A protein has these predicted regions:
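Conserved helicase motor
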Residues: 35-39
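C-terminal accessory helical subdomains adjacent to catalytic cores in phosphodiester-
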Residues: 1-4, 15-33, 44-60, 65-203
Length: 203
């Protein structure tokens, strides 16, 4: 019988990556609604509530490390009393874009650029989102450049269809098992969801 779980993510792209990661985990989850999607600060302010709610219903949470030192210290900062066993909190180092970049050869083909331009260790990138956008500037495909790269004079940090274009890549091309070879934080996340044992009504 599928294990019912709800999701929590920072944004729409994070949600799609998390859903696809779970779909590829080999586990039979019954995925419910995704909460959050209002940014990292909102997630941080409410993570305690999700941890309390996990007593009655399992949650899988994805957040970005951003500029914090390391995932364990961030988790201790957010949940100083620890995570409930029904709450799986995983941290992308340093942003979810590093997990996308980790499927390097396929992402290079998607952009139409040499594979050698994609970082081999995206978790080591200071700003993987900026790195991804700069790679997209070199794309041979005009539509991809227009979707991912901010338009000249725009005040936005991303292109007009950034989330939509990358969601399409994740759903149609990205494979977690391949990508986790280049991203330790993704590998840890995959193992965590493969081994979690949510229990309804557990206190």
């Amino acid at each position: 019988m599928p294990s019912p779980v709800s999701l929590v993510a920072e944004g729409l792209l994070d949600e799609q990556v998390l859903r696809h990661l779970l779909a590829q985990s080999g586990r039979d989850f019954a995925l419910g609604v995704c909460y959050g999607k209002r940014g990292r600060d909102h997630l941080a302010q409410n993570i305690g509530r999700f941890n309390q709610a996990a007593v009655h219903h399992p949650f899988i949470v994805l957040a970005d490390l951003e500029n914090d030192e390391c995932p364990p210290s961030l988790i201790r900062q957010w949940l100083p009393r620890g995570c409930h066993s029904n709450l799986v909190l995983r941290i992308a180092v340093r942003k979810v874009e590093s997990w996308i970049l980790a499927d390097g050869q396929v992402f290079a083909e998607f952009l139409g650029i040499p594979t050698a331009r994609v970082p081999l260790e995206p978790d080591g990138e200071t700003d993987p989102k900026a790195r991804l956008i700069n790679l997209a500037r070199r794309s041979r495909y005009r539509t991809i450049r227009e979707d991912l790269v901010p338009a000249p004079g725009s005040t936005s940090s991303i292109g007009k269809n950034y989330v939509g274009r990358l969601t399409g890549f994740v759903l149609n091309h990205w494979r977690a098992e391949r990508a986790c070879r280049n991203s330790p934080s993704l590998e840890r996340a995959l193992k965590a969801v493969q081994t979690c044992s949510p229990t309804l009504g557990q206190v």
